[in-house]
């Protein structure tokens, strides 16, 4: 059996899977991204996880595909990821290749990887144009146009989370203010809800009462 290892690096968790040629996930493994405070120590955890999956799976591993925030497809590096403690430019492809010995190791932005997966195996198989929006520790999007993934000149097309939504708004991990993901992401949704409640509490409560009234 031929298979590949898929890696999804998030700001909170890192998830891995053994995937066959049909796109079926045969095995899963995960660990906390937040258990590591720098790139070198994180790579030790990732290498250990990849090695565990390959050693416990019969067949031939054809390579590793990695989806990560600010993953640069062209350079094989994770660049300036606000929610990861990796620094300016983390050479994840080169580091993993040297450790596990696989030639075919590829990196892309996590939302781009999700969009490509939908195009090949999921709901986008019969669509030529669509956008996948990912919501987790951050906010991202992957864009398919004319059946092809849009990478952009520098590999960062579709960085929806860092579009300015509120001028001079909340401080983002990227250093700018008002980025969309500071208002709409897993770790910021509660803050947005709290601010909304304080700003217009009376109308919010009235709306809730109306909703419950209709349900009766």
Residue ranges of predicted features:
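Short glycine/serine/threonine-rich phosphate/pyrophosphate-binding segments
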Residues: 13-15, 113-115, 138-140
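Glycine/GP-enriched mid-protein hinge/lid loop-to-helix segment characteristic of carbohydrate kinases
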Residues: 17-19, 27-29, 39-41, 106-108, ...
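Short, basic/aromatic recognition patches
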Residues: 2-3, 128
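Glycine-rich phosphate-binding loop and adjoining helix at the ATP-binding site
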Residues: 34-35, 39-47, 51, 59-64, ...
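Short glycine-rich anion-binding loops that position phosphate/pyrophosphate groups of nucleotides
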Residues: 12, 69-72, 136-138
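Short glycine-rich, Thr/Ser-proximal phosphate-binding strand/loop in the N-terminal lobe
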Residues: 3-44, 77-79, 155
């Amino acid at each position: 059996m031929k298979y590949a290892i898929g890696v999804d690096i998030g700001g909170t968790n890192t998830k891995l899977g053994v995937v066959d040629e049909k796109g079926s996930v045969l095995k899963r493994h995960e660990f906390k991204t937040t258990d590591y405070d720098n790139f070198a120590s994180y790579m030790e955890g990732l290498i250990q996880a990849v090695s565990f999956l390959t050693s416990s799976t019969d067949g031939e591993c054809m390579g590793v595909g990695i989806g990560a925030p600010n993953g640069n497809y062209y350079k094989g590096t994770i660049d300036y990821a606000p929610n990861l403690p990796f620094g300016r430019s983390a050479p994840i492809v080169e580091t993993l290749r040297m450790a596990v010995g696989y030639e075919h190791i590829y990196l892309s932005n996590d939302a781009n990887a999700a969009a490509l997966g939908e195009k090949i195996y999921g709901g986008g198989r019969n669509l030529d144009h669509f956008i996948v929006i990912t919501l987790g520790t951050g906010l991202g999007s992957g864009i398919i146009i004319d059946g092809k993934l849009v990478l952009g000149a520098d590999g960062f097309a579709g960085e929806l989370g860092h579009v300015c939504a509120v001028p001079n708004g909340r401080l983002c991990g990227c250093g700018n203010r008002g980025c969309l993901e500071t208002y709409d992401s897993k770790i910021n949704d509660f803050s947005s809800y709290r601010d909304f409640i304080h700003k217009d509490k009376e109308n919010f409560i009235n709306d809730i009462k109306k909703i419950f009234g209709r349900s009766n």
